[in-house]
Swiss-Prot record:
SMART domains reported for this sequence: BIR (SM00238), RING (SM00184)
Keyword annotations: Apoptosis, Early protein, Host-virus interaction, Inhibition of host caspases by virus, Metal-binding, Modulation of host cell apoptosis by virus, Repeat, Zinc, Zinc-finger
GO MF assignments: zinc ion binding
Segments of this protein annotated with the region Disordered: 1-25
Composition skew (Acidic residues), residue ranges: 10-23
Family, per entry: Belongs to the IIV-6 193R family.
Name listed for the protein in its UniProt record: Apoptosis inhibitor 193R
ZnF (RING-type) ranges: 163-197
Organism field: Invertebrate iridescent virus 6 (IIV-6)
């Protein structure tokens, strides 16, 4: 694995000293090409099929194909990598090289937080407290009505935690200053808040 240069290396947006952690969120760069997964995946139409990692893995890690050998570039921080090996994990390589080069890639940080949330939280429908309640209700037919109410409440909770843009992912980002939420994928495609239509300049992690 090797880097092949980065753009905007002198841009304060990408310096660790200006990552916004001390002033209520990370400043986000908007209106970037290839902000969506599908757009990035389409850039790999000429990706040699025999090469690994796959174009899907690279796209999910934020990369687009430059149509030169196996060179790819992050849509957000412009990090460029080449000379991929079969054992390489695109996201881990992205994370490693941005850390080594002291690039503050908000896309990498967003995926890392989303992975943390997935690894440390139970599914809405597999909450251990809810499961225990449901088990107790199964043994008591007189409480069937309460069981239905509990299940409806659980479903409602899941709806609240679902991104209202894609209706697929869990919300993990807060738009600043309006306070509305988004998932880690949709936030990079937004120009204004889709709920209140106001502009936002930063995002922050949402702990639920």
């Amino acid at each position: 694995m090797d880097t092949c240069g980065i753009y905007n290396s002198d841009n304060e947006e990408f310096s660790q000293e200006n990552d916004g952690e001390n002033d209520g969120g990370d400043k986000i760069i908007k209106n970037l090409p290839f902000a969506s997964y599908d757009e990035r995946l389409n850039s790999f139409q000429n990706w040699p099929i025999q090469l690994l990692p796959s174009k899907e893995q690279l796209s999910r890690a934020g990369f687009i194909y430059l149509n030169i050998g196996d060179q790819v570039q992050c849509f957000y921080c412009d990090l460029k990598l080449k000379e991929w090996k079969r054992s390489d994990n695109p996201f881990e390589e992205h994370k490693k090289h941005t850390q080594d080069l002291k690039i503050n890639c908000l896309f990498v940080k967003s995926i890392e937080f989303d992975n943390f949330v997935k690894n440390h939280s139970e599914s809405c429908f597999q909450n251990p407290i809810t499961n225990n309640i449901n088990q107790d209700l199964d043994h008591n037919q007189d409480l069937d009505h309460n069981q239905d109410l509990d299940q409806n409440s659980t479903t409602s909770d899941c709806d609240v935690l679902t991104c209202k843009i894609c209706f697929t992912n869990k919300i993990t980002k807060v738009l600043i200053p309006c306070g509305h939420s988004s998932c880690y994928e949709c936030v990079f495609k937004l120009q204004t808040c889709p709920i209140c239509k106001n502009n936002f300049i930063k995002i922050n992690n949402l702990f639920i």
